[in-house]
Amino acid sequence: MSSNFEANNNNNGEKQLVCVTGAGGFIGSWVVKELLIRGYHVRGTARDPADSKNAHLLELEGADERLSLCRADVLDAASLRAAFSGCHGVFHVASPVSNDPDLVPVAVEGTRNVINAAADMGVRRVVFTSSYGAVHMNPNRSPDAVLDETCWSDYEFCKQTDNLYCCAKMMAEMTATEEAAKRGLELAVVVPSMTMGPMLQQTLNFSTNHVARYLMGTKKSYPNAVAAYVDVRDVARAHVLVYERPEARGRYLCIGTVLHRAELLRMLRELFPRYPATAKCEDDGKPMAKPYKFSNQRLKDLGLEFTPLRKSLNEAVLCMQQKGHLPLIYPVPKRAYL
């Protein structure tokens, strides 16, 4: 991270109160950790703050003095207003990963509630967590086109292919942008891709479970497909970075690399050769898919440096071993991941 970013954080973060929705999730937990490191006072929302699944947040450095958890639901506007009271900024991270048909209207209503509650309580700046599912799902995009902040997924294509999570993130992001403009809120949108790296929470999330299933060979084959990846710590830093830069508005594509699933599996096998990792590619009769071009320049221009995927995968697996989600079938190297 650049020295300018460090200085920015140290000067602006001290004593400021911000709220993080979905604080106990994979990304939300790292956003909370990053904010605490930077000196912020943090209020995290959860449906049940006393639930043991949120206990890891209270163990973070600085949590005793500067972290509080409160009960809030994105579908309950009154609970959001209470959570945002006295806050300078809001990080709207909360978002389930599913293909539930009800996800789209719930995501839209929840996002509208968050933006309006923030405006009602005098919050000036909101950072919204979108997804590259709102950006890259477009079958008509040229193979030579560069994926950047101007790109949007094709809603009808996502709907027809049952990618309802992508539909939900598209509509939620559009809602956030429209509502923020109406209410005069400053809005920055972080658009992360498949997020890798170590967990702070105890339970597996979508992407860590994805890695575990491939490493254990539970998935018998992998698709002839490419995907975009980014480290969860880079995603958290991106959130804080765009929050702290007054000029940062609009979308910020948060992608570290794009590669074929075969390359991901090759990395896993090289790092952890004793696991029975998935080795067979699904035969779809098509040539091997090629990685697409992308631009993460907007975040690089703000000082963000991206973590190599190999490091993210290594530390994700070590973390899952330490938390008991993967068997220890060979001596684990002593490496810190936090």
From Swiss-Prot:
Cytoplasm found in the keyword field: yes
Gene Ontology CC annotation, any one: cytoplasm
Inhibition and activation profile: Activated by the small GTPase RAC1.
MF terms in GO: cinnamoyl-CoA reductase activity; oxidoreductase activity, acting on the CH-OH group of donors, NAD or NADP as acceptor
Protein name as annotated: Cinnamoyl-CoA reductase 1
Subcellular locations according to the entry: Cytoplasm
Active site (record annotation): K169 (proton donor)
Keyword Disulfide bond among UniProt keywords: yes
Keywords assigned by UniProt, alphabetized: Cytoplasm, Disulfide bond, Lignin biosynthesis, NADP, Oxidoreductase, Plant defense
Record-level GO BP terms: defense response; lignin biosynthetic process
Family matches, as Pfam families: Epimerase
Organism expressing this protein natively: Oryza sativa subsp. japonica (Rice)
Annotated family: Belongs to the NAD(P)-dependent epimerase/dehydratase family. Dihydroflavonol-4-reductase subfamily.
